[in-house]
Amino acid sequence: VHETDIAAGRVLVATDASDRPVGVACVQGHAGEVDLADMFVDPPAIGSGAGRLLFEASVVLARGLGADRMTILADPHAAPFYERMGARFLRNAPSDAIPGRLLPLYEYDLTSGASS
């Protein structure tokens, strides 16, 4: 997450009932296509609905930016989550952080009625 993304209102934070942060997501890009970047849910909060809320809020934000698709370079352990959200697997793509590592790349169609 970059300071410019925070200033632009593109960073979303999920909190628990005590208002403690349990997850974060960042939408980066421009009209047409955006990336769901840096989405993370604290392991104890997995299964609480925080990930779904972050994903759905990211979809709303991306649509507000005028995007018609959102790409997601996912952690392999999170791949089933993105598939449940309706994202479509495209291919394996190089990791931005770890040279030589391939990660599943997904696409979410923002023109559909899902996750609105």
Task: Give residue spans per PLM region.
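Active-site acidic-Proline motif in GNAT/NAT acetyltransferases
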Residues: 42-44, 48, 76
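Short beta-strand "wing" residues that participate in macromolecule-binding interfaces
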Residues: 89
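C-terminal "cap" of GNAT-fold acetyltransferases
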Residues: 12, 68, 73-77, 85, ...
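Short glycine-rich hinge loops at helix-strand junctions in the catalytic core
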Residues: 49, 66, 86
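Conserved acyl-CoA
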Residues: 53-69, 80
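A generic "binding-loop/recognition-motif" signal
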Residues: 32, 77-78
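Acetyl-CoA-dependent GNAT
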Residues: 1-38, 42-44, 55-56, 61, ...
